[in-house]
Amino acid sequence: MALHTVLIMLSLLPMLEAQNPEHANITIGEPITNETLGWLSDKWFFMGAAFRKLEYRQAIQMMQTEFFYLTTNLINDTIELRESQTIGDQCVYNSTHLGFQRENGTFSKYEGGVETFAHLIVLRKHGAFMLAFDLNDEKKRGLSLYAKRPDMTLELREVFQKAVKHVGMDESEIIFVDWKKDKCGQQEKKQLELGKETKKDPEEGQA
Protein backbone atom coordinates (compact mmCIF):
# COMPACT_ATOMS: atom_id res chain seq x y z
CA MET A 1 0.00 0.00 0.00
CA ALA A 2 1.36 3.42 -0.89
CA LEU A 3 2.70 5.44 2.00
CA HIS A 4 0.58 8.48 1.17
CA THR A 5 -2.51 6.28 0.71
CA VAL A 6 -1.99 4.77 4.14
CA LEU A 7 -1.76 8.25 5.64
CA ILE A 8 -4.98 9.28 3.93
CA MET A 9 -7.00 6.22 4.92
CA LEU A 10 -5.92 5.84 8.53
CA SER A 11 -5.73 8.22 11.48
CA LEU A 12 -3.66 7.78 14.59
CA LEU A 13 -4.61 8.13 18.24
CA PRO A 14 -1.79 8.02 20.79
CA MET A 15 -2.90 4.98 22.79
CA LEU A 16 0.52 3.42 22.30
CA GLU A 17 2.10 6.11 24.47
CA ALA A 18 0.16 4.74 27.44
CA GLN A 19 1.78 1.34 26.93
CA ASN A 20 5.35 0.28 27.59
CA PRO A 21 7.13 0.22 24.22
CA GLU A 22 10.39 -1.18 25.57
CA HIS A 23 9.16 -4.75 25.13
CA ALA A 24 9.23 -4.17 21.38
CA ASN A 25 12.44 -2.08 21.43
CA ILE A 26 10.62 0.97 20.08
CA THR A 27 10.29 4.56 21.26
CA ILE A 28 6.99 6.44 20.89
CA GLY A 29 6.44 10.18 20.78
CA GLU A 30 10.00 11.38 20.28
CA PRO A 31 10.17 14.87 18.74
CA ILE A 32 11.23 15.08 15.11
CA THR A 33 14.52 16.98 14.93
CA ASN A 34 16.44 18.34 11.95
CA GLU A 35 18.84 15.43 12.41
CA THR A 36 15.94 12.97 12.11
CA LEU A 37 14.68 14.77 9.01
CA GLY A 38 18.13 14.58 7.45
CA TRP A 39 18.22 10.86 8.21
CA LEU A 40 14.76 10.38 6.67
CA SER A 41 15.79 12.17 3.45
CA ASP A 42 16.74 9.01 1.61
CA LYS A 43 15.47 6.10 -0.45
CA TRP A 44 13.17 3.75 1.50
CA PHE A 45 11.73 0.31 0.88
CA PHE A 46 8.32 -0.80 2.12
CA MET A 47 9.04 -4.04 3.97
CA GLY A 48 5.66 -5.10 5.30
CA ALA A 49 2.65 -4.23 7.41
CA ALA A 50 -0.10 -5.58 9.60
CA PHE A 51 -3.54 -4.02 9.15
CA ARG A 52 -6.80 -5.17 10.68
CA LYS A 53 -9.16 -3.66 8.15
CA LEU A 54 -9.77 -6.10 5.28
CA GLU A 55 -9.65 -3.59 2.42
CA TYR A 56 -6.27 -2.30 3.60
CA ARG A 57 -4.89 -5.83 3.70
CA GLN A 58 -6.24 -6.44 0.21
CA ALA A 59 -4.60 -3.23 -1.02
CA ILE A 60 -1.24 -4.41 0.31
CA GLN A 61 -1.68 -7.79 -1.37
CA MET A 62 -2.40 -6.09 -4.71
CA MET A 63 0.87 -4.15 -4.50
CA GLN A 64 3.89 -6.41 -4.88
CA THR A 65 6.57 -3.86 -3.92
CA GLU A 66 7.09 -0.17 -3.20
CA PHE A 67 10.12 2.03 -2.78
CA PHE A 68 10.13 5.78 -2.39
CA TYR A 69 12.27 8.86 -1.85
CA LEU A 70 11.69 11.34 0.96
CA THR A 71 13.00 14.89 0.57
CA THR A 72 12.45 17.20 3.53
CA ASN A 73 11.87 20.95 3.34
CA LEU A 74 12.88 22.57 6.62
CA ILE A 75 11.50 25.97 5.65
CA ASN A 76 7.83 24.96 5.48
CA ASP A 77 8.07 21.65 7.38
CA THR A 78 6.93 19.41 4.54
CA ILE A 79 8.28 16.22 3.01
CA GLU A 80 8.18 15.46 -0.70
CA LEU A 81 7.31 11.82 -1.36
CA ARG A 82 8.17 10.21 -4.72
CA GLU A 83 7.22 6.55 -4.90
CA SER A 84 7.40 3.63 -7.31
CA GLN A 85 5.02 0.69 -6.87
CA THR A 86 4.97 -2.68 -8.58
CA ILE A 87 1.34 -3.62 -9.24
CA GLY A 88 1.02 -6.77 -11.31
CA ASP A 89 3.55 -6.39 -14.13
CA GLN A 90 3.28 -2.61 -14.08
CA CYS A 91 5.45 0.01 -12.40
CA VAL A 92 3.32 2.89 -11.11
CA TYR A 93 4.80 6.26 -10.10
CA ASN A 94 3.28 8.85 -7.78
CA SER A 95 4.33 11.96 -5.91
CA THR A 96 2.79 13.99 -3.11
CA HIS A 97 3.71 16.02 -0.01
CA LEU A 98 3.46 15.09 3.66
CA GLY A 99 3.43 17.35 6.69
CA PHE A 100 5.09 16.59 9.99
CA GLN A 101 4.66 17.78 13.56
CA ARG A 102 8.00 18.13 15.30
CA GLU A 103 6.77 18.14 18.90
CA ASN A 104 4.78 14.89 18.94
CA GLY A 105 6.64 13.00 16.21
CA THR A 106 3.87 12.54 13.66
CA PHE A 107 3.49 12.60 9.90
CA SER A 108 0.32 14.09 8.46
CA LYS A 109 -1.58 14.15 5.19
CA TYR A 110 -4.19 16.78 4.33
CA GLU A 111 -6.76 15.44 1.87
CA GLY A 112 -10.34 16.41 1.14
CA GLY A 113 -10.48 18.85 4.03
CA VAL A 114 -9.37 16.21 6.54
CA GLU A 115 -5.93 15.91 8.12
CA THR A 116 -4.87 12.44 9.26
CA PHE A 117 -1.83 11.45 11.28
CA ALA A 118 0.64 8.60 11.69
CA HIS A 119 3.09 8.26 14.53
CA LEU A 120 6.73 7.95 13.46
CA ILE A 121 8.76 5.27 15.26
CA VAL A 122 12.45 5.50 14.38
CA LEU A 123 14.57 2.33 14.40
CA ARG A 124 17.87 4.03 13.60
CA LYS A 125 19.98 1.05 14.66
CA HIS A 126 18.29 -1.03 11.97
CA GLY A 127 18.13 1.69 9.31
CA ALA A 128 14.34 1.55 9.46
CA PHE A 129 11.19 3.23 10.75
CA MET A 130 7.62 2.25 11.50
CA LEU A 131 4.32 4.11 11.24
CA ALA A 132 1.53 3.37 13.72
CA PHE A 133 -2.16 3.88 12.92
CA ASP A 134 -5.50 3.76 14.73
CA LEU A 135 -4.07 1.86 17.68
CA ASN A 136 -7.14 2.50 19.85
CA ASP A 137 -9.45 0.79 17.37
CA GLU A 138 -9.23 -3.00 17.48
CA LYS A 139 -10.81 -3.31 14.02
CA LYS A 140 -8.66 -0.68 12.26
CA ARG A 141 -5.27 -0.63 13.95
CA GLY A 142 -2.15 -1.06 11.88
CA LEU A 143 1.63 -0.94 11.87
CA SER A 144 3.89 -0.61 8.82
CA LEU A 145 7.65 -1.02 8.36
CA TYR A 146 10.11 0.74 6.02
CA ALA A 147 13.87 0.21 5.65
CA LYS A 148 16.83 1.62 3.74
CA ARG A 149 17.62 -1.79 2.24
CA PRO A 150 15.26 -4.34 0.68
CA ASP A 151 17.02 -7.29 2.32
CA MET A 152 15.55 -7.50 5.81
CA THR A 153 17.73 -8.79 8.62
CA LEU A 154 16.39 -11.43 10.98
CA GLU A 155 16.80 -8.99 13.88
CA LEU A 156 14.66 -6.31 12.20
CA ARG A 157 12.01 -8.89 11.33
CA GLU A 158 11.86 -9.96 14.98
CA VAL A 159 11.63 -6.33 16.16
CA PHE A 160 8.66 -5.74 13.87
CA GLN A 161 6.96 -8.98 14.89
CA LYS A 162 7.29 -8.05 18.57
CA ALA A 163 5.95 -4.55 17.88
CA VAL A 164 2.93 -5.98 16.07
CA LYS A 165 2.15 -8.26 19.02
CA HIS A 166 2.72 -5.40 21.45
CA VAL A 167 -0.04 -3.29 19.85
CA GLY A 168 -2.50 -6.17 20.19
CA MET A 169 -2.17 -7.88 16.83
CA ASP A 170 -0.93 -11.31 15.78
CA GLU A 171 2.16 -12.22 13.76
CA SER A 172 -0.09 -14.04 11.30
CA GLU A 173 -1.57 -10.65 10.31
CA ILE A 174 1.78 -9.44 8.95
CA ILE A 175 2.23 -9.30 5.18
CA PHE A 176 5.90 -9.07 4.20
CA VAL A 177 7.07 -7.83 0.80
CA ASP A 178 8.76 -10.23 -1.62
CA TRP A 179 11.34 -8.03 -3.34
CA LYS A 180 11.95 -10.66 -6.01
CA LYS A 181 8.71 -9.40 -7.57
CA ASP A 182 9.99 -5.83 -7.99
CA LYS A 183 9.60 -4.37 -11.50
CA CYS A 184 10.48 -0.75 -10.73
CA GLY A 185 14.09 -1.15 -9.62
CA GLN A 186 15.30 -2.26 -13.04
CA GLN A 187 13.36 0.52 -14.75
CA GLU A 188 14.92 3.09 -12.43
CA LYS A 189 18.38 1.67 -13.12
CA LYS A 190 17.83 1.88 -16.89
CA GLN A 191 16.60 5.47 -16.60
CA LEU A 192 19.68 6.45 -14.59
CA GLU A 193 21.97 4.81 -17.14
CA LEU A 194 20.13 6.53 -19.98
CA GLY A 195 20.50 9.85 -18.19
CA LYS A 196 24.26 9.34 -17.87
CA GLU A 197 24.54 8.48 -21.57
CA THR A 198 22.52 11.56 -22.50
CA LYS A 199 24.90 13.76 -20.51
CA LYS A 200 27.91 12.17 -22.22
CA ASP A 201 26.64 12.68 -25.80
CA PRO A 202 26.85 16.53 -25.84
CA GLU A 203 30.35 16.34 -24.38
CA GLU A 204 31.43 13.85 -27.07
CA GLY A 205 29.96 16.11 -29.75
CA GLN A 206 32.06 19.02 -28.53
CA ALA A 207 35.25 16.98 -28.45
From Swiss-Prot:
One Gene Ontology BP term is: acute-phase response
What's the source species' lineage?
Eukaryota, Metazoa, Chordata, Craniata, Vertebrata
Q: In which tissues is it expressed?
A: Expressed by the liver and secreted in plasma.
Q: Which family does it belong to?
A: Belongs to the calycin superfamily. Lipocalin family.
**Pfam families cross-referenced by the UniProt entry:** Lipocalin
Tell me where in or outside the cell this protein is found: Secreted
Q: What is this protein called?
A: Alpha-1-acid glycoprotein 8
Q: Which PANTHER family match?
A: ALPHA-1-ACID GLYCOPROTEIN, ALPHA-1-ACID GLYCOPROTEIN 1
Q: Could you tell me the keywords of this UniProt record?
A: Acute phase, Disulfide bond, Glycoprotein, Secreted, Signal, Transport
Q: Where in the sequence does glycosylation occur per the annotation?
A: 25, 34, 76, 94, 104
Additional remarks: Eight genes coding for different forms of alpha-1-AGP are present in mus carolis.
> From which source organism is this entry?
Mus caroli
> Which Gene Ontology cellular component terms are annotated?
extracellular space
**Where does the protein principally reside?**
secreted
Q: Which cysteines are joined by disulfide bonds?
A: 91-184
What's in the domain note?
Answer: Contains a beta-barrel that binds various ligands in its interior.
